From Swiss-Prot:
This is tRNA modification GTPase MnmE. Transmembrane segments: none annotated. Exhibits a very high intrinsic GTPase hydrolysis rate. Involved in the addition of a carboxymethylaminomethyl (cmnm) group at the wobble position (U34) of certain tRNAs, forming tRNA-cmnm(5)s(2)U34. The gene is mnmE. Its main location: cytoplasm.
Length: 458
């Protein structure tokens, strides 16, 4: 997808394909109204007020055949998402009707939109910056209300405003330094310039580092925690998974080795999306299929952000239990003593501190797991502060880290007594890096790659 401005008219189905109450076919571009007028039977579209919904029919003019009864939305530039004329045809949901209407639109002069092209046009026409464009996709993919809150704030421009204000402050600083260097009016101009550069650099660095402190929380809320449920066979792992999901997803039996693969499901734990991985019981086995499951379990353990180790409190610790305790000791781990509804036989004094006794069968202490997750990953400080700006995107985090490195280079140069005019290079580099976040200084290849990840019709 080229990032150069194109002014042809594009169209796509904007709702998920499949059966549903409503389907939406979107048209955007200079000929949107003209194309819609050819296939719409109802009020004269050229006389219709912008931002209104209008009842009518979509008709194939070549056959004089009605395709569907619709509500047609007219939105005229520049007050639209793309800042172009936009038509949205609200049809009855279904693959056949929406596709038939789309093909009719394409035959009358529109081009099939590429993935993310509507949002790309919003970016190219100055309606949104890159952070806001990425927030659109984050909002679509949000799995919890907390992730949605972060995406909405970013879409509203919170990160854009912070970055743009910082870039402007950097420009102001560079301009002042340049004036001091080119037009020295005081004997101590060099000292004044060095002091200004040091103060501003430290200010910018502190701002960027504060932003980075939100990254861990923001990334978790955006992408979720990969959570491995581990334990020897038949200790209640699958029952725990089903309990957390509030539905039967894993087979639960008394037969060892029932879970032969890795089962993955998302669950919302107090606003945090957990990707729960129910692993096959880790044990020595000659069963080839089960052995593959065990190897996948070990891999899931290595890659997990959080480990839930399930032990059977009604039995003494086994060699397998001890092996799993050792294997997971460096992980963010919560040890769960299941089957507390039975007489306890496990050696509690040999276990790590802060284990949680639970009974999956009787749904006892499951809420304690949620509280412990909050303690481990959020320092019990709550999930999202209402007015805070969060970093949650890996691209943004990487660029902010690079900006901090550039600012550190300026500070180190000042400590070594390097001339301020040489240090302007690193300060300018910081300004450029921050511009990559908003798209003001992003390479064409990056922009093309970002929008290609969007769904068709968005």
């Amino acid at each position: 997808m080229s990032i150069t401005k194109e002014f042809d008219t594009i169209a796509a189905i904007s709702t998920p394909l499949g059966e549903g109450a409503i389907g939406i076919v979107r048209i955007s571009g200079t000929d949107a109204l003209k194309i819609a007028s050819k296939i719409y039977r109802g009020k004269d579209l050229s006389a219709i007020q912008s931002h209104t919904l209008n009842y009518g029919h979509i008709v194939d003019p070549d056959k004089n055949e009605i395709l569907d009864e619709v509500m047609l939305g007219v939105m005229l530039a520049p007050k639209t998402f793309t800042r172009e004329d936009v038509i949205e045809i609200n049809t009855h949901g279904g693959i056949a009707v929406t596709n038939e209407i789309l093909q009719l639109i394409l035959r009358h002069g529109a081009r099939m939109a590429e993935p993310g092209e509507f949002t790309k046009r919003a970016f190219l026409n100055g309606r949104v910056d890159l952070t806001q464009a990425e927030a659109v996709m984050d909002l679509i993919r949000a799995k919890t209300d907390k992730a949605m809150d972060i995406a909405v704030k970013q879409l509203d421009g919170s990160l854009k405003t912070l970055i743009n204000n910082t870039r402007q402050e950097i420009l102001n600083t560079l301009a002042q330094v340049e004036v001091n260097i080119d037009y020295p009016e005081y004997d101590d101009v060099e000292e004044m310039t060095t002091t200004l550069m040091r103060e501003k650099t430290q200010e910018f660095q502190a701002l960027m580092e504060n932003l980075l402190r939100t990254a861990r929380r923001g990334k978790i809320l955006r992408e979720g925690l990969s959570t491995a449920i581990i334990g020897r066979p038949n200790v209640g792992k699958s029952s725990l998974l089903n309990n957390l999901l509030r539905e039967e997803k894993a087979i639960v039996t008394d037969i060892e080795g029932t879970t032969r693969d890795v089962i993955e499901e998302y669950v919302n734990i107090k606003g945090v999306p957990l990707k729960l991985v129910d692993t096959a019981g880790i044990r020595d086995t000659d069963d080839i299929v089960e052995k593959i499951g065990v190897e996948r379990s070990k891999k899931a353990l290595e890659e997990a952000d959080l480990v839930l180790l399930v032990l059977n409190s009604s039995e003494p610790l086994t060699l397998q239990d001890r092996s799993l305790l050792e294997l997971s000791k460096e992980s963010n781990r919560i040890v769960l003593l299941n089957k507390t509804d039975l007489p306890q036989k496990i050696e509690v004094n040999e276990l790590p501190k802060n284990v949680i006794p639970i009974s999956v069968l009787e749904n006892e202490n499951i809420d304690k797991i949620e509280e412990r997750i909050n303690d481990i990953f959020f320092d019990n400080a709550g999930m999202v502060e209402h007015d805070a700006t969060y970093l949650s995107n890996a691209r943004h985090i990487s660029l902010i880290e690079k900006a901090v490195d550039s600012l550190k280079a300026v500070n180190e140069g000042l400590e070594l007594g390097m001339p301020v005019d040489l240090l302007q290079v690193d300060m300018t580099r910081t300004w450029e890096i921050l511009g990559e976040i908003t798209g003001d200084a992003a390479p064409d290849e990056l922009i093309t790659q970002l929008f290609s990840q969007f769904c068709l019709g968005k």
